[in-house]
Amino acid sequence: MPVQYRPLNEANLTDLVCCPGGLELAGKEFTGRLNRVTEWHQARLREGMRGLVAYDQKTPRGFVEYAPADVAPFPIEAPGACVLLCFHWAGTQPEDPQHLAEERRMIEAAIADAHQEFTGMAALGWNHPTHYPIVLLCELAFREVARDEPIALLWLPFRDGVEEPTLARPQFRPRDLRARGVLAIDQAWSARCPYSVHFAERMRNVVSAHPDRERIDLRQYRIDTRGEAERLAASPWDWGWTYLNGEEISLFQYGGDTWREEIARRVASLPGSSAA
């Protein structure tokens, strides 16, 4: 039986693979309150978010979400268009060819679903082989209209002569407290993603457990809505950025215990530290 798609709504939110009980979370340990992910989806659906849930042999395996640009929680200006928010196929490794093939089919279904109502679809792609890959989106006729490495703003017009989307001007300015002998950590997160909820909680735990906690100033910024995305725009990928004393840290630069080690290293190198 081929994969079937059903419209996303509040009745089938429990079928989303990234919500509590979903396939993406199975067998993994997460920290933080993951029911926030369900609450985020409920709120965005009320604002006009659309989506499709993919079922393989009646088992929920994936989803794709998009929203009108004027409510989409990304720093993208695209009057009359929609914005691709998230897509994921669970149960395979990202490097598995089936993974990207199924994600491609889901996006194709979303494009067909959005084609009549909107002037086009904007998306953010990454210069990365499996994480929102630019190559995958370009295979679906998206074209690059702006770049903020490693992220590209991509555009698929549904009509001739429609206005291209643009990235909003960055509004957020990260802090640098080195002169005071303090490590400023500015971090964005969002309840839209269980990994983001988990990472934000893990960062809080790392900072609270540091022996020189008073030398760390952690500020976390929750970006769930369009207004928050505009006000706190620092990177196009507006809910995954981290700055250490003003230095932007790549989403993939550190993982696991390496964050603890990197923060300890930076605190030790601050002015006034015995190790500096």
Regions found by a protein language model. Give the residues of each.
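Conserved acetyl-CoA binding element of GNAT-fold acetyltransferases
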Residues: 75-98
